[in-house]
Amino acid sequence: MTKRTFGGTSRKRKRVSGFRVRMRSHTGRRVIRTRRKRGRSRLAA
């Protein structure tokens, strides 16, 4: 039996891949645009 290695930290996750971080850069905005187009219910972490 293998142990779960992903702990998950809310603050770190938001700082790396949150909505405001995505909107800062051109490529980040492209990510949001693509996810909107695909109809994702959650655009960012």
UniProtKB/Swiss-Prot annotation:
Can you provide one Gene Ontology molecular function annotated for this UniProt record? structural constituent of ribosome
User: What InterPro entries is this protein classified in?
Assistant: Ribosomal_bL34 (IPR000271), Ribosomal_bL34_CS (IPR020939)
Q: Where is this region: Disordered?
A: 1-45
A cellular component term from Gene Ontology for this protein is: ribosome
Q: Name one Pfam family in it.
A: Ribosomal_L34
What segments bear the compositional bias annotation Basic residues? 10-45
Keywords linked to the UniProt accession: Ribonucleoprotein, Ribosomal protein
Is Ribosomal protein a UniProt keyword of this protein? Answer: yes
Tell me the GO BP annotations in alphabetical order.
translation
Protein family membership: Belongs to the bacterial ribosomal protein bL34 family.
* HAMAP family (UniProt xref): Ribosomal_bL34 (MF_00391)
What name appears for this protein in its UniProt entry? Large ribosomal subunit protein bL34
Organism per entry: Synechococcus sp. (strain CC9311)
